């Protein structure tokens, strides 16, 4: 009797273990949860109202979130360093009044007024960063105080009046152009470009890696040669400039300089960042996640409005979403340990 030999298997004994790796990565990716929440929200509102799933409504959502989205990019940078900025909406409002009034009264040409607004908002960010890093003071206290400072300056400088009769360059980004089945504003393209730029900076540059390192452990980052003081101040300053860009987008969308603008944008920007999977404890998150979070906020507000839900209940639901998102983040952090 001759023994027959079985040819050796060419497949790796770990093939079955490796096969689901890609699927597992997708399921455990930080943006998977927010993306699933966005799709579920879209499905719910599509079934709840016939007006939701239309090209015109999607265009409206994009227009509504471009301002908060730009604020949320700056907020993401700060939260990644384990900070927070409660002043973003007020700083944006003050920047919008500076730009609008300087241009409307002819004090400065429109482009110079825009540049001044960016410098002013960047200055607020710089001051926040210096107070947080050099004194040092808790980011919550610093930005809460700066919120009141910017709010007061907005009403003082505007004299409680809405600035109208703005020159064309200030509202140009609010103009629309056809794209597929809907219309898109030029300002929306600016916001998307900013998301892409900051996503690249955080994921593919040394500066971005330093931001994550600072959020994970300031002491470890310092021991590894990262200039944490300069980095923190730089992050707050960049965020301030982004608030200035948001001010211009706000003007282009509304066509006026409104001293009452931005009062709910602080909460909305933080909500978008948290819903997008960025940890309030720093060191974990992404601009892509924030982009999804911004869309979640926009879809919820738009869908609830179409359903006739009162604004106070929309605020209530937004608050609940924030608490749930932070709770999930805290639970996942404990499991990771």
Residue ranges and their predicted role:
Residues 139-205, 231-234, 253-262:
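Transmembrane helix-bundle core of multi-pass membrane transporters
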Residues 107-147, 292-293:
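Alpha-helical transmembrane segments within multi-pass membrane transporters and channels
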Residues 40-106, 130-137, 273-288, 320, ...:
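Single transmembrane alpha-helix segments in multi-pass membrane proteins
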Residues 2-72, 107-112, 226:
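Membrane-interfacial amphipathic/re-entrant helices at transmembrane-helix boundaries
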Residues 197-237:
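Membrane-helix/interface signature in polytopic inner-membrane proteins
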Residues 141, 222, 227-251, 263:
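Transmembrane alpha-helices
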Residues 236, 243, 253-319:
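Transmembrane alpha-helical segments in multi-pass inner-membrane proteins
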Residues 65-75, 90-94, 123-126, 145-148, ...:
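Hydrophobic alpha-helical segments embedded in the membrane of multi-pass proteins
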